[in-house]
């Protein structure tokens, strides 16, 4: 199955995403802030789910940073 990275500032939502996707057989990593992402983690993920309305660095900024890490 897929390696999925979920980034959301809401801990309960991170838990829900993890539980739901793992039940379907996926491997899931969650982070509560975009700043916690590393190049290795971004390369590991087949799919990255981002909250676009996080405080501080929003999902759009995280997406731009991920692109710069993996280019």
Question: What is each model feature region?
Answer:
Residues 41-44, 65-71:
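Conserved phosphotransfer cores of two-component systems
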Residues 25-33, 39-40:
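Short hydrophobic/Thr-rich beta-strand motif most characteristic of the beta2 strand and flanking loop
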Residues 15-19, 23:
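Charged docking surfaces used in two-component/phosphorelay signaling
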Residues 6, 10-13:
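Short acidic/polar segment at the start of the alpha1 helix of CheY-like receiver
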């Amino acid at each position: 199955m897929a390696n999925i990275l979920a980034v959301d500032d809401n801990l309960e939502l991170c838990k829900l995403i993890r539980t739901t996707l793992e039940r379907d057989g996926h491997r899931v990593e969650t982070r509560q802030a975009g700043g916690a992402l590393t190049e290795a983690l971004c390369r590991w993920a087949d799919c990255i789910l981002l909250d676009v309305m996080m405080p501080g660095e929003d999902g759009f900024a995280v997406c731009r940073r991920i692109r710069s890490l993996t280019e």
